[in-house]
Amino acid sequence: MKSIRNSAKAVIIRDDRLLLTKNKDDESFFYLFPGGGQEKEEELKDAAVRECMEEIGQEVEVGELLFVREYIGKNHQFAEWDSDVHQVEFYFRCSLKHPDAAMGNGIHPDEHQVGVEWVPFDRLREIRVYPSALGEKIRSGVFGPCYVGDVG
């Protein structure tokens, strides 16, 4: 089994919209929170800043920790190829340092990433957003409890 991986994610909200990366697979489009793996000797907040530059091309200011989510691959719909993955994800409230700057893919977008999109809260139920449980919490304005466990 692989070792447990830490990941820092950004929750960026503006005018009842959530900034997400737009991705495409064989099925359709899906949306993810910007962020990714923590590197050795890197603080989680620094990982969130670096990952946002890579994925959304924007500098962010990292605020409070909102959620801690575990992803245990064997328990989710992608178990066929993710069964040995165990990741602990830390979701931070972030804000854009330059909110009026042009938005688009960053300097190193993820493999399936095709763009960046401000998604209105009322659309979060209509799209594939991962993890969907956190999309629902944010849509409802619920920012607790911090530890949410292995939710999809």
Predicted regions span which residues?
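A generic structural micro-feature
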Residues: 2, 80-88, 108-113
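A short coil-to-beta-strand element that immediately follows conserved catalytic motifs
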Residues: 59-68
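Conserved Nudix-box catalytic region and its N-terminal flanking loop in Nudix hydrolases
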Residues: 17-58
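Conserved N-terminal beta-strand and adjoining loop/helix that marks the start
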Residues: 1-19, 66, 91-93
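Active-site-adjacent beta-strand/loop module that shapes the phosphate/pyrophosphate-binding cleft
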Residues: 73-103, 137
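NUDIX/MutT-family hydrolases
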Residues: 105-138
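Charged phosphate-binding loop/patch that engages nucleotide di/tri-phosphates or the phosphate backbone
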Residues: 130-152
